[in-house]
Every structure is written in structure tokens, then in C-alpha cells.
Amino acid sequence: MSDKIGLFTGSFDPMTNGHLDIIERASRLFDKLYVGIFFNPHKQGFLPLENRKRGLEKAVKHLGNVKVVSSHDKLVVDVAKRLGATCLVRGLRNASDLQYEASFDYYNHQLSSDIETIYLHSRPEHLYISSSGVRELLKFGQDIACYVPESILEEIRNEKKD
């Protein structure tokens, strides 16, 4: 029997405790879970890709079956096929997230009918945390320590020094 391999993707700009919770829970469902940082190289992100990847790798180092990868200009289903993933993992905070994700699920299934999508609901304590909300707080100099993993906080601090 082959390994169960999953893929959880996002821009993680920055990664939040909500993302980490989904990763930890999904890691228990798969033999191998890839966390894919998908980014647009033509768009200026808040945190450079290297910082996002380094912070994410540190945040998940306690999960032996999780590997962080990055991609650009590729469809999620193509990356999933390349990695041998048969399941995409998506986190949901609310009905709007479900509606948004369902449209991608439709196209992904049309492109590759053997790849399934599973949805994990956010824990109540993470329902209102978003990367855009964290970026907004940072813009106004607010403390974000309770919204992001320590490793991400370190990357943001290091980036601000430069």
C-alpha cells in the first residue's frame, strides 16, 4: 500500500497560528504532508519568500512528516502530481472561505479527478486570524505575538532590521 500524501498550500504572508493548527492536524492524517508556499514572483509580498520558508520550516520542525516546498507559476494540481499527493488540504474559517475554496475544488477536480480536497475547520480561537489582519496590525506598530508562531515573529523582526 502506498503512502498517503497530502498538500496544504498558501502564500503564508505571514504564516499565522491558524495555519500552524491546520498543518498540525493535517499531519496526523497523512504519512507525508507537504506545505507549499505558492507565490507570485511579479508581486511584492510583505515578507520575502526566503523568510516565509525559513520561519515556516522552524514552526513545523516538531512534525517529522511535514516538508515545506515552494512554487510559482504552477497549478496546485500539477505540483500535487509531481509530489505524489492525492489530497489537497484546505482550512476554512467561515462560509465565505468555503465558497471561495469550492470554486478552486471544482477546477482542480476537472484537471485531475484523482486528487481530492479535504477541508479542516479552524478552531474557534483561530476563526478571526488572517494574514491580512496581521499585516494590518503590523502596519500600525501593534504586537502580533499571539497571532503568529515565534519563528515567524523572528523573521519579521529580522526583516525590519534590514
UniProtKB/Swiss-Prot annotation:
Keyword Acetylation among UniProt keywords: no
Keyword Cytoplasm recorded: yes
Enzyme Commission designation: 2.7.7.3
Residues involved in ATP binding: S11, F12, H19, G91, L92, R93, E101, H126, L127, Y128, I129, S130, S131, S132
Keywords carried by this UniProt record: ATP-binding, Coenzyme A biosynthesis, Cytoplasm, Magnesium, Nucleotide-binding, Nucleotidyltransferase, Transferase
SUBUNIT field: Homohexamer.
Catalysed reaction, written as an equation: (R)-4'-phosphopantetheine + ATP + H(+) = 3'-dephospho-CoA + diphosphate
PANTHER family: PHOSPHOPANTETHEINE ADENYLYLTRANSFERASE
Entry binding sites for substrate: S11, K43, V76, R90
Family the UniProt entry places it in: Belongs to the bacterial CoaD family.
Function in brief: Reversibly transfers an adenylyl group from ATP to 4'-phosphopantetheine, yielding dephospho-CoA (dPCoA) and pyrophosphate.
HAMAP family found in the cross-reference section: PPAT_bact
Molecular function in Gene Ontology: ATP binding; pantetheine-phosphate adenylyltransferase activity
Protein's name according to its UniProt entry: Phosphopantetheine adenylyltransferase
Any Pfam family: CTP_transf_like
Annotated source species: Streptococcus pneumoniae serotype 4 (strain ATCC BAA-334 / TIGR4)
Cofactor(s) listed in the protein's UniProt record: Mg(2+)
